[in-house]
Amino acid sequence: MLKKTLLSLTAVSMLASAGSALAAEYKFDKEGQHAFIEFRIKHLGYSWLYGSFNDFDGTFAFDEKNPSADKVNVTINTNSVDTNHAERDKHLRSAEFLNVSKHPQATFTSTEVKKDGDDYDITGNLTLNGVTKPVKLDAKLIGQGDDPWGNYRAGFQAEGTIKLKDFNITTDLGPASQDVELIIAVEGVRQK
């Protein structure tokens, strides 16, 4: 009886650990320009200023049936900030904002993924300007399936908000310009 119980417990623990290992690994499709990291911030409270980071890389693990096995990792070259205005971009790269000479990369590493209806709540650590803080992203699965080139793809859009001061960006842009909205749209190619 004890032997059967031990065998059952061993089998259950192996299945549980195998479940977390079943999440498929995906790499962001940057070559086809099917991945974007964008942001927007209010300009003095009068309008939105939009920008993006053009150089980044990332991976995610996705198991639709076991979201707790899902993971997201993103690395951003902060020097690639682009708001369609060269002087503003230069200012954003300076020590007053992103301080790219001292902090050339920003990273996001998920710590937990939970399914919430049709959406996913992704919690993780964002390191920006040398400061690491927890951030929550609300993500949606846009679609998944085979592509014409023999690969399998999955696409997500995630959104979240960060406060500039939380990341030691203390330049005062006025009370309406303290929060930055993040929009991340990625299409990942499943790794074989």
Swiss-Prot record:
Localization: Periplasm
Gene Ontology CC annotations of this record: periplasmic space
Location, primary (coarse class): periplasm
Gene3D superfamilies xrefs: Lipid/polyisoprenoid-binding, YceI-like
Record flagged with keyword Metal-binding: no
Domain of life assignment: Bacteria
SUPFAM superfamilies tied to this protein: YceI-like
Pfam families according to UniProt: YceI
Keywords attached to this entry: Periplasm, Signal
Signal peptide limits: 1-23
Sequence similarity: Belongs to the UPF0312 family. Type 1 subfamily.
Protein name: UPF0312 protein ECA1782
Lineage: Bacteria, Pseudomonadati, Pseudomonadota, Gammaproteobacteria, Enterobacterales
